[in-house]
Amino acid sequence: MSQSPKVGFVSLGCPKALVDSEQIITQLRAEGYEISGTYDGADLVVVNTCGFIDEAVQESLDAIGEALTENGKVIVTGCLGAKSSASGSNLIEEVHPKVLAVTGPHAVGEVMQAVHSHLPKPHDPFVDLVPAAGIKLTPRHYAYLKISEGCNHRCTFCIIPSMRGDLVSRPVAEVMLEAENLFKSGVKELLVISQDTSAYGVDVKYRTGFWNGKPIKTRMTDLVAALGELAAQYGAWVRLHYVYPYPSVDEVIPLMAEGPFKGHVLPYLDVPFQHAHPDVLKRMKRPANAEKVLERVQKWREICPDLTIRSTFIAGFPGETEAQFETLLDFIREAELDRVGCFAYSPVEGATANELDGALPDDVREERRARFMEVAEEVSARRMQRKVGKTLKVLIDEVGNEGGIGRTAADAPEIDGVVYVEPAAKASKRYKVGDFVSVKITGADGHDLWGEV
């Protein structure tokens, strides 16, 4: 019996890219290819790239170079595949002319076509061995659910639309079927992702779809309600990411706070505010201003007191004055956002922000980022201390000799904090990866918690 052809895989970038990788690997396995964990054990290598910021571009180019050196046969896909060099040619092909093929992001068909060209698929693949939920690169107890591709916004600092195109929403029945299959496979936490989760359905004018005979609009609020109902059947969590601050977000908060979905649609919002001063937001082509956002945050917390808000910001954007930056710091103090990240503005090739006046020196941008994070960490530490003494539901991610590591409803994997859980004193309280356990919080710092079952 001949050996199945083997494909190595390198996945870089954000959760959206990870989902693309999962879809490609699922198709490879469905067609009978094996996935190799090493370069030398693979017949060829697929590298899924990121091209959002300069550091990501360099990391991707380095990964391609390593794969070429170690294996020699490389197919490249992902956001960097859609990027041109200064001369107008494909950047990857210019830097690494020996790659076999290059595609853009979200291109399963093109990647498979390239694989077939250089490594013909085996006969009679055992397609029934591939689970309905697909191949996942995350641990078995959580998974990402991508509901749309692309973005209709044209933020001046971002080049994602030029790489991934305008918004294309997945049919609601298709999303629900994938969610059900994931829950059936044992997933305890579903992380809803896209470039713009709030815009789900805009491109199809909120068309009504059907799931199990029930009508569901292709709209964020309706989808979240349907996912919450499904999650409740399996005792699972649904977490929302990349929620652009549309007015429609206000409709989701009650689903987190009360009724049958409470505890399943997590009181957690990942909202990329980016800044707080209206003039800076205007230059970014972003909505809102600090006063309106503060009012909304306060209203959200009135409705849902347990709400956790995560956000990202940019310090040192072109034209940002010291006074405008101070407005941002004041906003962070007043809004008391739970989890924040901040980037010192970095020019991205192809972004229209590069044409704006008032570019700031590198040291000023970095100094403002550092000051921002000092304030943010003070706020986070205060909010974390309020959890000491409470008993919280924790999803266990790891178990070792010294206890477990898990996350509360306030913590998304990889980007937020964790809970360090003491070893169970009694056999009846022992836990394993993927279990939900009640943990009494005994300590906290600015990021993480400590507790006991």
Swiss-Prot record:
The keyword Iron applies. One of its GO terms (cellular component) is cytosol. Its cofactor is [4Fe-4S] cluster. Catalyzes the methylthiolation of an aspartic acid residue of ribosomal protein uS12. Belongs to the methylthiotransferase family. RimO subfamily. Its main location: cytoplasm. [4Fe-4S] cluster 1 binds at residues 14, 50, 79. One of its GO terms (biological process) is tRNA modification. [4Fe-4S] cluster 2 binds at residues 151, 155, 158. Residues 137-382 form the Radical SAM core domain. GO terms for molecular function: 4 iron, 4 sulfur cluster binding; aspartic acid methylthiotransferase activity; metal ion binding; protein methylthiotransferase activity. Its EC number is 2.8.4.4. CDD domains: Radical_SAM. HAMAP family: MTTase_RimO. It is found in: Cytoplasm. This is Ribosomal protein uS12 methylthiotransferase RimO. It comes from Burkholderia vietnamiensis (strain G4 / LMG 22486). Keywords: 4Fe-4S, Cytoplasm, Iron, Iron-sulfur, Metal-binding, S-adenosyl-L-methionine, Transferase. Pfam families: Radical_SAM, TRAM_2, UPF0004. Binds 2 [4Fe-4S] clusters. One cluster is coordinated with 3 cysteines and an exchangeable S-adenosyl-L-methionine. It catalyses: L-aspartate(89)-[ribosomal protein uS12]-hydrogen + (sulfur carrier)-SH + AH2 + 2 S-adenosyl-L-methionine = 3-methylsulfanyl-L-aspartate(89)-[ribosomal protein uS12]-hydrogen + (sulfur carrier)-H + 5'-deoxyadenosine + L-methionine + A + S-adenosyl-L-homocysteine + 2 H(+). Residues 5-120 form the MTTase N-terminal domain. Residues 385-453 form the TRAM domain. It comes from the Bacteria.
